């Protein structure tokens, strides 16, 4: 049985851990609010940009290689977004298992599946399984910015336009709430703007767009806007992943703090029982010694 000194040391150690987990929870909560604001602020712009592209494409019958589906998909690039750090529950393992399941179920039917990892946890997981990445980006939590997303997007776009891949998919945690993240796989390229819906709207609407004069040409406008749209989608996925990471870490640290509190209560109860037993034993020894002296 542990001594009073050992139990006292365990209580102090658990209290120190509790302080750390509580602080991490507060930090994650602050970062989560910032990430949520990024997501909320970009949505109106993203929707407006998507509508403008679709309107121009439908009314002027303009297309672009980024929008054209390949007849047969043989080469796929899988962009996997995880975190650099742990202590966020099953956040990373869920993404890695999802991506691994996709790889195992499609590697026989596809000629090539390449991986681009954003976040160290995904890279390390697949590296242990002998799968190498075509690119590997870390420090997502610290350097999350539109510039970083643009860098990733341009790398992916260039590979796609050069014909290296027929399809680009991204696996990430879609942010629902602080306690809910859903692993999602989206097709990034070719870009799907829901052209059927926009065409119906264009057919029933006025013909103002048809009579507009574009400068530069619609083809050039579509090119610039599609690239901006793609960069924005990559940034959105990164932002949702970061928000999900902070939400998962906040939840995990809250559970850890509560568990530490329960452990402290149990250890304190055990400490008090042992101390009471020790005091009782000492009193019995004193009384027994006094009785022996009387006798």
From Swiss-Prot:
It is a peripheral membrane protein. GO terms for biological process: proton motive force-driven plasma membrane ATP synthesis. The keyword NADP does not apply. The keyword Transport applies. It is found in: Cell inner membrane. Belongs to the ATPase gamma chain family. Produces ATP from ADP in the presence of a proton gradient across the membrane. The gamma chain is believed to be important in regulating ATPase activity and the flow of protons through the CF(0) complex. Transmembrane segments: none annotated. Signal peptide: none annotated. One of its GO terms (molecular function) is ATP binding. PANTHER family: ATP SYNTHASE GAMMA CHAIN, ATP SYNTHASE SUBUNIT GAMMA, MITOCHONDRIAL. GO terms for cellular component: plasma membrane; proton-transporting ATP synthase complex. Keywords: ATP synthesis, Cell inner membrane, Cell membrane, CF(1), Hydrogen ion transport, Ion transport, Membrane, Transport. This is ATP synthase gamma chain. Its main location: membrane. InterPro entries: ATP_synth_F1_ATPase_gsu, ATP_synth_F1_gsu, ATP_synth_F1_gsu_CS. F-type ATPases have 2 components, CF(1) - the catalytic core - and CF(0) - the membrane proton channel. CF(1) has five subunits: alpha(3), beta(3), gamma(1), delta(1), epsilon(1). CF(0) has three main subunits: a, b and c. It comes from Bdellovibrio bacteriovorus (strain ATCC 15356 / DSM 50701 / NCIMB 9529 / HD100). SUPFAM superfamilies: ATP synthase (F1-ATPase), gamma subunit (SSF52943).
């Amino acid at each position: 049985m542990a001594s009073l000194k050992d139990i006292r040391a365990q209580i102090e150690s658990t209290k120190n851990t509790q302080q750390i987990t509580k602080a991490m929870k507060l930090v994650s909560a602050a970062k989560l609010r910032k990430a949520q604001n990024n997501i909320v602020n970009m949505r109106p712009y993203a929707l407006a940009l998507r509508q403008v592209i679709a309107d121009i494409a439908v009314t002027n019958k303009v297309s672009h290689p980024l929008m054209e589906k390949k007849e047969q998909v043989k080469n796929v690039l899988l962009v996997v977004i995880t975190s650099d750090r742990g202590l966020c529950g099953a956040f990373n393992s869920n993404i890695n298992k999802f991506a691994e399941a996709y790889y195992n179920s499609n590697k026989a039917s596809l000629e090539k599946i390449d991986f681009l990892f954003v976040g160290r946890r995904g890279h390390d997981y697949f590296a242990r399984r002998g799968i190498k990445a075509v690119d590997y980006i870390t420090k997502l939590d610290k350097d999350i910015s539109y510039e970083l997303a643009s860098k990733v997007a341009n790398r992916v776009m260039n590979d796609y336009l050069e014909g290296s891949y027929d399809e680009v998919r991204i696996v990430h945690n879609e942010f629902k709430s602080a306690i809910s993240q859903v692993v999602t796989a989206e097709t990034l390229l070719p870009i799907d703007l829901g052209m059927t819906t926009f065409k119906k709207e264009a057919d029933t609407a006025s013909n103002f767009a048809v009579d507009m004069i574009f400068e530069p040409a619609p083809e050039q406008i579509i090119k610039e806007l599609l690239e901006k749209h793609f960069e924005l989608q990559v940034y959105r996925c990164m932002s949702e992943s970061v928000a999900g990471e902070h939400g998962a870490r906040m939840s995990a640290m809250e559970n850890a703090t509560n568990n530490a509190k329960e452990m402290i209560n149990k250890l304190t109860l055990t400490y008090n029982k042992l101390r009471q037993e020790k005091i009782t034993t000492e009193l019995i020894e004193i009384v027994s010694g006094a009785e022996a002296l009387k006798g």
